[in-house]
């Protein structure tokens, strides 16, 4: 399922409704994969998602989101009672380009 997200502090951050299937699945099994929306030049990251609920970190996530997406959301957007905020710590990443499909695949381990 597509999500808005931000790369910061060596992790991928995003939020989802607390009751969504995405949140429920990650709370049951924290292993996950994240990919870019560009199918011609994809980057795929696999890692572990951790629920974030401390106010200081949520305030930083909100600032990153507002800056990236030019929004003006308030902390209500990340209220832990209604929404889940996750930090995905990457284990590895894989990328390739459509121009050099067979020669460009690259893998990084973190």
Regions found by a protein language model. Give the residues of each.
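Alpha-helix boundary recognition
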Residues: 27-28, 66
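Short beta-strand segments
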Residues: 1-18, 23-26, 32-37, 43-48
